[in-house]
A protein has these predicted regions:
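Non-catalytic terminal extensions that flank enzyme cores
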Residues: 1-170, 174-180
């Protein structure tokens, strides 16, 4: 198996990493970086509250554990080549308690975190296919800032929610993107 087909969450994290949304992070974290972020909420001497990981299931790990290079695909489209792949494990219950709090067992993402993250991967990447590393609802921060400058907008308000955007949110975003 020289291919890894990634899921929607991994694709989203990958796009965000490549577009500096998680700045100063440029890659999925290594084990040492993960522990530093969880314990100190810090990465490269800057506040960083949650590690951005690339987890794989037990099934995928059993197929790829001896390889060091792969091609990443999302929805059958080539994204990039990854190499210098290293795998690591963590005490997921201990980590979950730090991430989700003392009632971590009741947290909606706890079971998903355990199920989807048998092992974690850290790697370098090359040969990105930029065209396939885009999403119609994503605008890179750098492009968004340029649009603001062009329109001479000096004030901006925003909001954030943990909830998944529904159709009304998508319509609002689409409407606002067309305005810019």
């Amino acid at each position: 198996m020289n291919k890894i087909h990634i899921n929607k969450n991994q694709f989203s994290d990958l796009i965000n990493l490549l577009n500096n949304v998680f700045y100063p992070l440029k890659n999925f974290v290594s084990k040492n970086e993960f522990i530093k972020i969880i314990n100190d909420k810090e990465y490269k001497n800057q506040f960083f509250p949650l590690p951005i990981t690339f987890g794989i299931t037990k099934e995928i790990y059993s197929k790829i554990k001896d390889r060091k290079s792969f091609d990443l695909y999302y929805r059958k489209k080539y994204l990039m080549n990854i190499y210098n792949v290293s795998f690591y494990s963590l005490d997921k219950k201990k980590i979950s308690r730090k991430i989700y709090g003392i009632n971590y067992l009741k947290h909606p993402y706890y079971k998903r975190f355990i199920k989807e993250n048998f092992k974690f991967m850290h790697f370098d990447y090359q040969s990105e296919k930029k065209k396939n590393l885009q999403h119609k609802y994503f605008v890179a921060p750098s492009i968004f800032k340029k649009r603001l400058k062009i329109k001479k907008i000096s004030t901006l308000s925003s909001f954030h929610t943990r909830n998944v955007p529904h159709k009304a949110h998508q319509w609002i975003h689409s409407f606002l993107f067309k305005k810019f």
